[in-house]
């Protein structure tokens, strides 16, 4: 379906099923973290999936391309981003499979029915509070800093919305790993799988991918590290596979 592009917007190829996404580089474009999260996550065709803080809809689009889930929903508080996500859904003729809802993560348990999702994904803001921000209202600030929601907001709402045995997938920063694990256990989301992401083999990890299961048993697998670059500008083969090249 043809859709209208607004000022400064562009259409990018997602390298999956011919899908495309509308983005505005002056606002916020999806990053590698969202792509790696979809490479780490698993879903089944019968699953009903929710993406919290969906932005321009990158995670629902990629998860639909990979797993053809029964239905996917993206929740996004910023109307401009939600509008781009809806138009991207229409651009790919996926209106019958993906819904984009404008709303606050803190209100997610009021927007959606309890225990109604098999799988929940989230690429949340990583940075605590508004430290160093000149304009907390900017879309990039809202996406990167806990201006409008906190880690606990994400985890507590996920715990209410996941079905028993449902899976939660999140990408975050290693410096908050202790807090993340404590929060997951507090809300009875048992950490089951973790993978650290390193920019180069000789550098410290700068991302961590986590899977938790609602009501799961206490046992976690730490997967082998994921290395992004073999040299500047050249991805490792695993990264090319995740991107679909």
Where in the sequence are the language-model features?
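Short, structurally constrained coil/turn elements
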Residues: 15, 43, 94, 185-188
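Mobile active-site "lid"/loop adjacent to the S-adenosyl-L-methionine
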Residues: 124-153
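Conserved SAM/SAH cofactor-binding pocket of Class I
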Residues: 40-133, 156
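Short loop/edge segments at beta-strand edges and connector loops
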Residues: 23, 102-103, 172, 195
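Conserved Class I SAM-dependent methyltransferase catalytic core
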Residues: 148-199, 203-205
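Conserved beta-strand segments of alpha/beta enzyme cores
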Residues: 20, 71, 97-99, 190-193
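Class I SAM-dependent transferase core
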Residues: 2-45
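SAM/dcSAM-binding transferase cores
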Residues: 204-245
């Amino acid at each position: 379906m043809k859709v209208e592009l607004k000022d400064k917007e562009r259409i990018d190829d997602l390298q999956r099923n011919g899908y495309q996404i509308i983005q505005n580089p002056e606002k916020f474009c999806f990053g590698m973290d969202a792509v790696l999260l979809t490479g780490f996550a698993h879903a089944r065709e019968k699953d009903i999936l929710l993406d919290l803080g969906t932005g321009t809809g990158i995670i629902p689009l990629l998860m639909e391309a990979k797993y053809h889930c029964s239905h996917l929903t993206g929740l996004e508080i910023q109307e401009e981003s939600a509008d781009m996500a809806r138009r991207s859904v229409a651009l790919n003729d996926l209106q019958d499979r993906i819904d984009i809802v404008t709303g606050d993560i803190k209100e997610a348990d009021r927007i959606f029915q309890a225990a109604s999702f098999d799988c929940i994904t989230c690429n949340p803001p990583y940075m605590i509070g508004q430290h160093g921000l000149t304009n907390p209202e900017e879309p990039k600030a809202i996406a990167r800093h806990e201006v409008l929601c906190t880690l606990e907001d994400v985890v507590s709402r996920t715990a209410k919305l996941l079905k028993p045995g449902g899976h939660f997938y999140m990408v975050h920063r290693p410096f908050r790993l202790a807090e993340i694990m404590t929060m997951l256990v507090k809300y009875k989301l048992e950490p089951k799988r973790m993978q650290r992401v390193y920019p180069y083999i000789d550098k410290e990890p700068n991302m961590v991918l986590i899977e938790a299961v609602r009501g799961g048993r206490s046992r976690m697998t730490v997967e082998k590290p994921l290395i992004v670059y073999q040299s500047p500008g050249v991805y490792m083969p695993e990264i090319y596979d995740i991107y679909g090249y």
